[in-house]
Amino acid sequence: MVTVREEIRKGPWTEQEDLQLVCTVRLFGERRWDFIAKVSGLNRTGKSCRLRWVNYLHPGLKRGRMSPHEERLILELHARWGNRWSRIARRLPGRTDNEIKNYWRTHMRKKAQERKSNMSPSSSSSSLTYQSCHPETPSMIIGIEEQELHGGSGCITSIMKSTPVDMDGYPMDQIWMEIEAPNVLPGPCFDEAKDSASNSLSGPLLPYPMWDYYCPETCLRMDDEIKVAPQFGYGKGVGPCY
């Protein structure tokens, strides 16, 4: 006759299984978990029975959140021993190694989130500070791009645009003054000499045709000026004096 071996049960524990395990442990104690699993009639392994008892069914377990003293002690012991959860659990009565490990992971996850939230406002404020200290208008950006595109010729172009020179509107009076300037002899002008002469006389100055029809010595150099005038648009026989 062939006996059919039942399959080992896995998954969540029921209330009936918890009661059977508690009664068996009270009878035989917390040892020989393979024997307890067999005697109790539970279709569970010895390891599963032990973990269920230690983490959930032990009467000395503490329930609820960690106290501040327990939290501080966990941090100190972990800094000293690392991830040796069973050794840390011995220093905290009523707390299991699995519970301590879960608390540590939750604590580290919360600490990482706080660090990330503290870093994000500082980075955004630094970018805003840089933008406020270094504003770049669209015209500045376009000017920089044009300067880079033309190989640095943007400065020359801007200077030429800012200081336009209108050669067509160059006054002819200024041209004649520049032509006559090198030939004028230094000394008092004719008007000053006329005033000084009038002041030196005791009586009133009599009218004399020479004063009204005086022509500067530039008229004597008519031939030389006619040669220069055509390059400025004047025809033959046209000069500064008539």
Swiss-Prot record:
Motif Bipartite nuclear localization signal 2: chain residues: 109-117
Compositionally biased residues, Low complexity: 118-133
PROSITE patterns: HTH_MYB
Motif, Bipartite nuclear localization signal 1: chain positions: 62-65
SUPFAM superfamilies: Homeodomain-like (SSF46689)
Domain HTH myb-type residues, every copy: 5-61, 62-112
Full protein name: Myb-related protein MYBAS2
Taxonomic source organism: Oryza sativa subsp. japonica (Rice)
Protein's gene: MYBAS2
